[in-house]
Amino acid sequence: AGETYTLEETLVPDNSGYVPANAIQFTVEDNGKVQHVIMQDDYTKVQISKTDIATGKEISGAKLKITDADGKTIAEWVTDGTPHYMERIPMGTYTLTETVAPIEQGYVRAESVTFEVGPTENIQRVEMKDDFTKVEIFKADMTDGHELPGAKLKITDASGNTIAEWETNGQPHRIERLKPGDYTLTETAAPAGYLLSEEVHFTVQETGEIQKVTMYDAPAHSLILTKRDIATNAKLADARLTIRDAYGTTIDRWTTTDGD
């Protein structure tokens, strides 16, 4: 019988992305023939996921990059809704950075993620989670601040496009994943016993914190206004009237139907 030996890999090629192979035992037979011993190196495999913090689903449209410990960029890409797979990354410490969030979908940039690529041929997984914008709309009584049901509201963007419409139910109305930017909250119909409110302009910031917007309604008082012809005293229809307070704030506006 021949002698038995062990072949070990003590050092892999620098910056190659290969991982040390398992030791191999082999026996040299005393038969005069050439014997071949093959040691195969596997390599590192890294899977990067960009997911929604709430649903865990993969997100498309995020611009990501990976830098090494020296700050050198080794990879950049735009997510496509599937995990990003990389091979042969040298072992070491890396940082995953989101340079641009998919704000069109209402997401905000995530904090950078530091990760290690270790000496293994198994897939090493790294996940970066994106938070999203959250806006709470409050419709409140001007006198005591309690929430009002029965108001019809809508939100429009800077281009005048309607983003959302709803009727209040006495609870704050929450909207998620609004694109950061400028918006207008409009009351199209006031609750019974209240006057129509002025529009509220607000800006959605790029943050995962809850952003609050409040629109107040003033209670209506018992007041009958009539629009008449100065000569005939006849009631006039189709007159557009506005009531403003001492500060110039619009309290109510309407078009007369039969003079009232």
Task: Annotate the PLM regions.
Residues A1-D260:
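Solvent-exposed loop/turn and edge beta-strand elements of beta-rich ligand-binding domains
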